[in-house]
Amino acid sequence: MSDKLPYKVADIGLAAWGRKALDIAENEMPGLMRMREQYSASKPLKGARIAGCLHMTVETAVLIETLVALGAEVQWSSCNIFSTQDHAAAAIAKAGIPVYAWKGETDEEYLWCIEQTLYFKDGPLNMILDDGGDLTNLIHTKYPQLLSGIRGISEETTTGVHNLYKMMANGILKVPAINVNDSVTKSKFDNLYGCRESLIDGIKRATDVMIAGKVAVVAGYGDVGKGCAQALRGFGARVIITEIDPINALQAAMEGYEVTTMDEACQEGNIFVTTTGCVDIILGRHFEQMKDDAIVCNIGHFDVEIDVKWLNENAVEKVNIKPQVDRYRLKNGRRIILLAEGRLVNLGCAMGHPSFVMSNSFTNQVMAQIELWTHPDKYPVGVHFLPKKLDEAVAEAHLGKLNVKLTKLTEKQAQYLGMSRDGPFKPDHYRY
């Protein structure tokens, strides 16, 4: 790999703009700044060669530079062909960190970019930071000879965590992994509050549509679906939920949402959002019953929720309105507006989640990398969680920015509750 390019980005000339954006983001990411303050001197990640596969955004750039400040060598690719922010990638490349990512990669280029991150000047990767599982899967299937040298995987998102548990159940997983997604300060913040803001940003930038008065259909009522439903309702839409899980369906109903099937909802909706992480959510028979100019988008990790293939094969006309916005005309004369080719709408059509909420998620990522690198004996092959105490530390690091003042337990109160005055304050089974 000695002839490897030092980086490949869309335009290195965007680096100065990217650096300005990073400077602003750092002020909105107190958790990562706390990590730098605590650990930049001791360098707990010294010797770690981290291959990262996660959306190459401004916020991710702050994460990357935090990992480097803590002693790691880092090489990076994006986990989605549309999610790279080219100015952020340029800033990281200009800083001398190998990054292989640009907005609008082909599927072949996407794989090439990931493969560039596997070998460092001193040897192959020994840590994985993944989002969605593509890097994890690639190494397990195509580069299994590298597995023995890898200490751990930290996985960012719901889809990637599902993949890890599936691999574990099938006896395929060969490396210890930490499920970052299900840290409370990730899933209950990034998935919920992040989507609550970035979904609307993506839809508005793509279409300028008026949401008030429309009928919006949200497929799935997990944390992501909850955030999306709140956002659409907040803008004045009447929101319909589809669900497979009776508990989530009951939650949605108790919040005042109508809950029905996609076969029924497809006839009513003006805006459709898939959030499930599953396949075949919106199919050809649904498109055929939709209203004219229905807007269809996805905020789950992969492009498998919406049957884009059916649209491409059955529409009589496809018109590209602008990048990541396509209008299909069906045989019945009605049009469908598809955003980001069925991939992540908030990153394909907008800038993704705000920096502050990503600081929660990425502080968990840094902690997971430190845990796996410095305490390998604690983590056998399997899927693990960060300790509750670290979850609480992530939250605490973000309180000052919001002027939050915590109440401190008295010694008497702590004894009454049977806990330390310093936490952890909830048992592991507590759901928040």
From Swiss-Prot:
Entry cofactors: NAD(+)
SUPFAM superfamilies: Formate/glycerate dehydrogenase catalytic domain-like, NAD(P)-binding Rossmann-fold domains
Region (NAD binding): 183-350
EC number: 3.13.2.1
Annotated GO MF terms: adenosylhomocysteinase activity; NAD binding
Pfam family, one: AdoHcyase
N6-(2-hydroxyisobutyryl)lysine: modified positions: 186
Cofactor: how bound: Binds 1 NAD(+) per subunit.
Subcellular location: Cytoplasm; Melanosome; Nucleus; Endoplasmic reticulum
Residue numbers carrying N-acetylserine: 2
PANTHER family: ADENOSYLHOMOCYSTEINASE
Protein name, entry field: Adenosylhomocysteinase
Organism for this UniProt entry: Macaca fascicularis (Crab-eating macaque)
